Curated annotation (Swiss-Prot):
One Pfam assignment: PTS_2-RNA
Name used for this protein in its record: Probable RNA 2'-phosphotransferase
Name of the top EC class for this enzyme: transferase
Function of the molecule: Removes the 2'-phosphate from RNA via an intermediate in which the phosphate is ADP-ribosylated by NAD followed by a presumed transesterification to release the RNA and generate ADP-ribose 1''-2''-cyclic phosphate (APPR>P). May function as an ADP-ribosylase.
Length: 186
């Protein structure tokens, strides 16, 4: 499969499995799982040709491990990033490392310095374990910058953290005092 086709299918899967399953008539269960046969059928009705092999290829070759296929091979879900309140991934709370990183665009820094980090349309704020990943995330929205987050200190003060199957760290919010005041700019 070409890189362009792979990217198109990945974006489509992200859209329907994270944000708008109803756009193609797909139903997710409360854990975010969709039946693969139903996904293929709904996609076909929407004019998109998906096969089990194409879906498996996208799952296997995703560097960010955005999707998971169930143990029985019948269902698929997005690892994290859901905007739908009906999806509850039931992550287990986890103690974070001392620091995690948040990639964003420099144009958002003033707002972040006033409000902290908020999930926006997602359920959680997403944090990365390393600066390189955070830079990649930040550059999707403009000139990237990386914020260093005092996550262990947050945890010690009662904030809850989760880690998605693909390694992305999640929390409900990051108040300003826990954000390193000097962002790293590439």
């Amino acid at each position: 499969m070409s890189n362009t086709k792979h990217a198109d299918v990945s974006k489509f899967l992200s859209y329907v499995l994270r944000h708008k399953p109803e756009a193609i008539g797909l139903t997710l269960n409360s854990g975010g799982w969709a039946n693969i046969a139903e996904l293929i059928s709904c996609a076909a009705k929407d004019g998109r040709l998906l096969t089990r092999e194409v879906i498996q290829s996208v799952v296997d070759n995703s560097d960010k491990k955005r999707f998971s296929i169930s143990a029985d091979g019948l269902s698929i879900r997005a690892a994290q990033g859901h905007s739908s309140a009906q999806v509850d991934m039931r992550y287990e709370p986890k103690v974070p490392p001392e620091f995690l990183y948040h990639g964003t665009a420099t144009r958002f820094i003033d707002s972040i310095n006033q409000q902290g980090l908020r999930p926006g349309s997602r359920q959680y704020v997403h944090l990365s374990a390393d600066e390189a990943t955070a830079i990649t995330v930040g550059q999707r929205h403009g000139k990237p910058t990386v914020l260093k987050i005092k996550t262990l200190e947050m945890h010690q003060q009662g904030f809850i953290f989760y880690q998605a199957d693909n390694g992305v760290w999640l929390t409900l919010t990051v108040p300003v005092p826990f954000i390193d005041s000097t962002p790293f700019i590439d």
